[in-house]
């Protein structure tokens, strides 16, 4: 009679152990997180097999013979590494290995024209210099949300075969067609329900940026009549290769996909990469996927143009901070879209892109605070979801204290909305009539409403106005100083980013809750300014195909239009807002002198940041090591087109910058140094440079001294080298923080 009891007890114990085992397995699985394992450059050995090596490492670390559910992605064409699902302890083991540079989480990053090119002087005219043969051999890689291949902006009509150097493919997925303009397409987004595996653009963002950089010239383009004109890229004859890393279903752009896109784009032999993507915060280079990809691209002669981000106007918000990336801020152009609100007692001017025409008819006005029976005054004033009473807003124009929730007013039956914002240089698109007002104008509307029993207003269709003051830096983009490398100025340059009309994807709505579909749309952000600079860089490369990425970047920076802190309320951070100034494509063709920094210069720069010999060898892929002199070298002495130093607040300072210029102007040239700006005492030695031949190099030092800026302040000057024909301008910035 005891045997059944023993058996029952034994079974119970086994069952309990299985439960614990499964629970433990579930916990282990839940504890796994996707990480990027960065291993530097690909070894030069002919017998090296990256995928086999990655598999072997994972098997050793995890103790599992089958790693199919662990390995996410390999990087094997342009640099070395992989993405994998790891526990915290496995991550730590990998990070300690001699062959590994860094291990960091697979994070999600964010996506960050008919008149802008004319505004910059690069006009559609026979007088505009173009080298179309070389331009047609230029390939711009676009790492973004894909592309709408049927757009006229990407038509292959009139194009010959792809350049012979092209090593890429077109893997665009189902119903995706390539041509001799759109020569390559790849996608790295995960398979999600409702979003086919394809390089097709379901966000509109990638089509917009690609056409801004290199779209064909397409006439009679507008957004419902706004911004009517010819939409074109900076280099219409150039080819486009698309690398899709963002999808609406992913809610961002994954780190592993971005690195895979760089891995392929470099090996595919693109000339320039534009990537309007970034994080909210800056990261060390070895944990920043864009900085990692950009370093290996730079080493192969490819310029990376990256958006500064849209987290401004607060200081220290720029996330694109590596010196081997060209970081772009945003400005306006001389064109603006204005949505007028006509009140019973006058007019006020708002700012948005309103394509809806209410024929000037006036409708009753109601304030969100007065249109709620379920929320407090603050939430109702913001028109927060669930607060508005449809009976109180239906058929009326609703005032909302925030631009975040006009869709809520529409959902409750409002005819239009007037919203308050502290930024009117962001012309957003809405799915019904909306006008955006600054505080003073918004208060004018409120005062009018309080002065009459039956307030009414009309929200008019947007008008296009020209000749506004421009270029002025935008409010929204991220500012310096550089929080990782304080002595490198970021952003580098400013370009048009506000209210840009460019190609769009009919597979995506132009705004949230929008049922309309368009082929061209208006968008705003450093995402839009970034491809402008990529287009300018490609334009320069068509005249100077052998120039290195740093030479092209230097030419653009040192010939930029000067900007200053007095032209806009958002310019108060001066060079930390606009960098070297506003891009000037035509002048950049002939810069006279350039500051060049190649791979070895950047390795020396990393030596000064105390990178280990092991990591330097892995990153460089060669036997690079640091000399004692390089170890002591200051980051400010990288041969960069701008000069920046962080000093102690309110204390006398003296800083020295060492630079070398290369003559790309004319032989037998003599350049004299001139310093503009009285807030710094600057000495240049030598103050005269005589260059007998092209590509001759000359070195000099710049010593800046002074009493010391207050905390959170900067002082600046401009160094200008000139031979009477060329004016090579570099900002000198000295600042103090807390």
Curated annotation (Swiss-Prot):
Subcellular localization: Secreted
Carbohydrate-modified residues: 175, 228, 450, 564, 598, 610, 668
Boundaries of every Peptidase S8 domain copy: 116-589
Protein EC: 3.4.21.-
Residues forming the catalytic site: 144 (charge relay system), 205 (charge relay system), 527 (charge relay system)
Propeptide residue span(s): 26-112
Protein name per the record: Subtilisin-like protease SBT4.5
Gene label: SBT4.5
């Amino acid at each position: 009679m005891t045997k059944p009891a023993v058996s029952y007890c034994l079974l119970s114990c086994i069952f309990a152990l299985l439960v614990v085992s499964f629970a433990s397995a579930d916990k282990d699985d839940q504890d796994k997180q996707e990480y990027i394992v960065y291993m530097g450059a690909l070894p030069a050995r002919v017998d090296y097999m990256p995928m086999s090596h990655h598999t072997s490492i994972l098997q050793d670390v995890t103790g599992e013979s089958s790693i199919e559910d662990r390995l996410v992605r390999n990087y094997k064409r342009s640099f070395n590494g992989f993405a994998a699902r790891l526990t915290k302890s496995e991550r730590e083991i990998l990070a300690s290995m001699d062959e590994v540079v860094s291990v960091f989480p697979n994070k999600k990053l964010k996506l960050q024209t008919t008149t802008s090119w004319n505004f910059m002087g690069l006009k559609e005219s026979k007088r505009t210099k173009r080298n179309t043969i070389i331009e047609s051999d230029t390939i711009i890689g676009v790492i973004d949300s894909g592309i709408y291949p049927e757009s006229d902006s990407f038509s292959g009509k009139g194009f010959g075969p792809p350049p012979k150097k092209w090593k890429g493919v077109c893997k665009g997925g189902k119903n995706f067609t390539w041509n001799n303009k759109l020569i390559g397409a790849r996608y790295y987004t995960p398979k999600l329900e409702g979003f086919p595996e394809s390089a097709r653009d379901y966000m509109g963002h990638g089509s917009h940026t690609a056409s801004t950089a290199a779209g064909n010239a397409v006439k009679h383009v507008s957004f419902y009549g706004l911004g009517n004109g010819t939409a074109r890229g900076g280099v219409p004859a150039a080819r486009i290769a698309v690398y899709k890393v963002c999808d609406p279903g992913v809610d961002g752009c994954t780190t592993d996909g971005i690195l895979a896109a760089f891995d392929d784009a470099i090996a595919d032999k693109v000339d320039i990469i534009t990537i309007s993507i970034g994080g909210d915060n800056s990261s060390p280079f070895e944990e920043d996927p864009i900085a990692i990809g950009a370093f290996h691209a730079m080493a192969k002669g490819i310029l990376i143009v990256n958006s500064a981000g849209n987290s401004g106007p607060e200081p220290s918000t720029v996330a694109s901070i590596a010196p081997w990336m060209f970081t772009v801020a945003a400005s306006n152009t001389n064109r603006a879209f204005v949505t007028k609100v006509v009140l019973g007692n006058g007019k006020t001017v708002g700012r948005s892109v309103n394509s809806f025409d209410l024929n000037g008819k006036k409708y009753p006005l109601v304030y969100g605070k007065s249109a709620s029976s379920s929320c407090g005054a603050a939430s109702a004033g913001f028109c927060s979801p669930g607060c508005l009473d449809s009976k109180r807003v239906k058929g009326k124009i609703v005032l909302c204290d925030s631009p975040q929730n006009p869709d809520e007013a529409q959902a409750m039956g409002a005819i239009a909305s007037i919203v308050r914002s502290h930024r009117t240089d962001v012309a957003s698109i809405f799915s019904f009539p909306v006008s955006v007002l600054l505080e003073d104008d918004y208060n004018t509307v409120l005062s009018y409403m309080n002065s009459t029993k039956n307030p009414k207003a009309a929200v008019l269709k947007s008008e296009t106005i020209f000749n506004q003051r421009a270029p002025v830096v935008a409010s929204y983009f991220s500012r310096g100083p550089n929080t990782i490398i304080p002595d490198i100025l970021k952003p580098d340059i400013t370009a048009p980013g506000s209210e840009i009309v460019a190609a769009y994807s009919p597979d995506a709505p132009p705004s949230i809750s929008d049922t309309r579909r368009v082929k061209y749309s208006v968008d705003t952000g450093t995402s839009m300014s970034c491809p402008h600079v990529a287009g300018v860089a490609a334009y320069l490369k068509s005249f100077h195909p052998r120039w290195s990425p740093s030479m092209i970047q230097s030419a653009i920076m040192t010939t930029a239009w000067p900007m200053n802190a007095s032209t806009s309320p958002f310019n108060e951070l001066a060079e930390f807002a606009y960098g070297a100034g506003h891009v000037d494509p035509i002048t950049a063709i002939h810069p006279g002198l350039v500051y060049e920094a190649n791979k070895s210069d950047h390795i020396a720069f990393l030596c000064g940041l105390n990178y280990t010999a092991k990591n330097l060898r892995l990153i460089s892929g060669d036997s690079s090591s640091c000399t004692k002199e390089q170890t002591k070298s200051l980051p400010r002495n990288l041969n960069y087109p701008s000069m920046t130093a962080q000093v102690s607040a309110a204390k006398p300072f003296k800083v020295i910058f060492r630079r070398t210029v290369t003559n790309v102007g004319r032989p037998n040239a003599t350049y004299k140094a001139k310093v503009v700006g009285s807030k710094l005492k600057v000495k240049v030695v030598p103050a005269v440079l005589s260059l007998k031949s092209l590509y001759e190099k000359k070195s000099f030092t710049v010593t800046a001294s002074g009493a010391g800026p207050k905390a959170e302040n900067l002082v600046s000057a401009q160094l200008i080298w000139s031979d009477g024909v060329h004016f090579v301008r570099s900002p000198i910035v000295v600042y103090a923080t807390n």
